[in-house]
């Protein structure tokens, strides 16, 4: 399995960058991981939020591999437990899926058009997280899913 991660904008907070690197290293023990960061648009007085969302969404769409199962993180998406995520991943593998692509948006999220292109809309929680924090939480949950699938004791 190969995991593609598409992030909008750089992770600015050092503690989050360090956590992301830690969990990328852990996750790479189980699967191939490729991270693509697309440039975020600057939101100024003159710019319109809809233009920013459309532009960032187009960049993300261009970065998604054609043969990947495309997952958009969205607060209206499906919520899963950690075990549920692991079982969902296993079912995809059993159907022949070899690539997953997770997209984490910028501060304004994604366009409805990009959401409609996703095979799965995934919510990390009912709570709201910053887009940068969502990256770290997603990586930890993907790592946790790998340990669950292999019966390892990280998940208690």
Residue ranges and their predicted role:
Residues 1-3, 31, 68, 117-119:
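Short glycine-/polar-rich loops that comprise or flank the Walker A/P-loop
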Residues 1-27:
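N-terminal beta1-alpha1 ligand-phosphate binding loop
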Residues 5, 71, 105, 138:
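Conserved RecA-like P-loop NTPase ATPase core
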Residues 6-8, 36-38, 103:
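Short hydrophobic segments within beta-strands
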Residues 11, 75-78, 106-109:
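Short glycine-rich anion-binding loops that position phosphate/pyrophosphate groups of nucleotides
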Residues 17-20, 82-86, 115, 135:
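Conserved strand-to-helix beginnings and helix N-cap segments that scaffold or border functional pockets
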Residues 32, 36-100:
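S-adenosyl-L-methionine/SAH cofactor-binding core of RNA-modifying enzymes
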Residues 108, 112-156:
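Structured adenosyl-cofactor binding patch, chiefly the S-adenosyl-L-methionine
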